[in-house]
């Protein structure tokens, strides 16, 4: 007998939300170091909005340890493969480098912005998966992180 779908750990993250501001401003928040520090709580970022640009974000290591992932924080980095100003970002060959453990990757990060009335429909998807407990735990943890960060992004941009 297979487990109910709700009990299956996620193998990617995807969320869509409506933000009351122009798409160009939403997309810009994924590249502006000051904005990234506010909504994503990053301590440092290097993000280049062009094909083959670097996309790297660093967080302070946590003091507590996850049983499977170790300390959280560390660096997420990849290569910008596609960038359409105000509309789309695609980062490939992305990896999470935790403070103390082995990297997790490769992954992809997709961000799209669509005008909807006077607002922006933001879609964020992070994918890439290896069938292991560590990967499943990673997606369970980042889902909470993304949800909190995207809520902060919305609040930051709607002020």
Residue ranges of model-derived segments:
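Short acidic N-proximal helix/loop "leader" segments that mark the beginning
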Residues: 1-14
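A generic structural micro-feature
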Residues: 7-9, 69-74, 101-105, 116
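Hydrophobic/aromatic beta-strand elements that line small-molecule binding cavities or substrate pockets
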Residues: 15-17, 45, 76-82, 107-115
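Short, conserved beta-turn/loop elements at beta-strand boundaries and strand-helix junctions
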Residues: 84-89
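Beta-strand/loop substructures that line and gate deep hydrophobic ligand-binding cavities in soluble
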Residues: 98-144
């Amino acid at each position: 007998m297979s487990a109910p779908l709700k009990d299956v750990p996620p193998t990617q993250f995807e969320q869509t939300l409506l933000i009351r501001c122009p798409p160009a401003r939403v997309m810009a928040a994924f590249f502006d170091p000051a904005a990234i520090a506010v909504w994503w709580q990053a301590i440092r970022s290097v993000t280049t909005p062009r094909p083959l640009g670097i996309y790297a974000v660093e967080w302070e290591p946590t003091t507590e340890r996850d049983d499977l992932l170790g300390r959280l924080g560390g660096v997420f980095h990849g290569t910008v493969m596609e960038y359409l100003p105000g509309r789309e970002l695609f980062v490939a060959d992305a990896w999470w480098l935790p403070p103390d453990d082995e990297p997790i990757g490769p992954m992809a990060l997709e961000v799209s912005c669509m005008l909807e009335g006077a607002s922006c429909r933001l879609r964020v998807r992070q994918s890439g998966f290896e069938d292991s407990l560590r990967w499943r735990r990673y997606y369970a943890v980042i889902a909470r992180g993304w949800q909190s960060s995207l809520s902060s992004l919305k609040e930051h941009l709607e002020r």
